[in-house]
Amino acid sequence: MLQTALGTRGMVTAPHALAAQAGLDILRQGGNAIEAMVAAASTIAVVYPHMNSIGGDGFWVILPPNGSPLAISACGGAAAAATIDAYHKRGMKRIPMRGPWAANTVAGTVGGW
């Protein structure tokens, strides 16, 4: 059976109780929703790592209560040698999906936090 939770001062939901508690603790200390989300996400990375980790990227769209929307792109960069010219010099028309010239990026999640 579904259970409905209602609140008037904020709430946090997460797939692990410790993550939800971390977010709730931030709200109780006067933090905002973004700070609570970071607390919950970083906790999930430890207690539930197969669901969320610091090894990815983050793309956020945030709408402040009295402001304009803003975006955060927490995407890590590729290696400095992964340039268009470098691929063309090696006769490549596309970036390979695998192998030493696949342009994997460095994780950007923590930078977004």
Residue spans for each PLM region:
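Noncatalytic scaffold domains of N-terminal-nucleophile
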Residues: M1-Q21, D25, A33-G112
